[in-house]
Amino acid sequence: MTTIVSVRRNGQVVIGGDGQVSLGNTVMKGNARKVHRLYNGKVLAGFAGGTADAFTLLERFEAKLQAHQGNLERAAVALAKDWRTDRALRRLEALLAVADEHKSFIITGNGDVVQPEHDLIAIGSGGNFAQSAAIALLENTELDAKSIVEKSLKIAGDICVFTNGNHTIEVLDYSAK
């Protein structure tokens, strides 16, 4: 799997993820890009799970964003409905973390769209480790969102064998608005 972390703080939302692709117990690739900017850079998305499945879902999500003029919540719900009802999509095993300047969501294959507590998302095999680290950093430091994501991914990578140190991090800065 992988680790994807999203933190929102002080006018920024950040999503970061590692680059490891595993096949069983073998590392197949170490520099996969699992975090992307969508909808003219206004939406961030990261995925965990089967890489081919996740790319399929990411493409579908991007199409939903276009269809709903960038409305993140409506696009997330539309994708979740399709994911739940489409026989082919139902077999896909992945999770998506998506965020814009207003909201963040986790989209699951069960058709769930979850708005997380504390504007923090951590998914994938190292998600619990990254979430614990991010909560501690949010509650006990004044670090910015990007630094918290970086440190959380590092900690998760030190513990989880399916998470590496090759990170992709995207920042959406809306503090000037």
Curated annotation (Swiss-Prot):
Catalytic activity of the protein: ATP-dependent cleavage of peptide bonds with broad specificity
List of residues binding Na(+): 157, 160, 163
Cellular compartments per GO CC: HslUV protease complex; proteasome core complex
Pfam families on file: Proteasome (PF00227)
Active site residues according to the UniProt entry: 2
This enzyme's EC code(s): 3.4.25.2
Inhibition and activation profile: Allosterically activated by HslU binding.
GO molecular function: metal ion binding; threonine-type endopeptidase activity
Cell compartments where the protein resides: Cytoplasm
Keywords: Allosteric enzyme, Cytoplasm, Hydrolase, Metal-binding, Protease, Sodium, Threonine protease
Annotated GO biological process: proteolysis involved in protein catabolic process
InterPro entries: ATP-dep_Prtase_HsIV_su (IPR022281), Ntn_hydrolases_N (IPR029055), Proteasome_sua/b (IPR001353), Proteasome_suB-type (IPR023333)
Principal location: cytoplasm
Class of enzymatic activity (EC top level): hydrolase
Quaternary structure and interacting proteins, as annotated: A double ring-shaped homohexamer of HslV is capped on each side by a ring-shaped HslU homohexamer. The assembly of the HslU/HslV complex is dependent on binding of ATP.
Function, in words: Protease subunit of a proteasome-like degradation complex believed to be a general protein degrading machinery.
NCBIfam families documented for this protein: ATP_dep_HslV, PRK05456.1
Family under the similarity heading: Belongs to the peptidase T1B family. HslV subfamily.
Name the UniProt record assigns to this protein: ATP-dependent protease subunit HslV
Originating organism: Aeromonas hydrophila subsp. hydrophila (strain ATCC 7966 / DSM 30187 / BCRC 13018 / CCUG 14551 / JCM 1027 / KCTC 2358 / NCIMB 9240 / NCTC 8049)
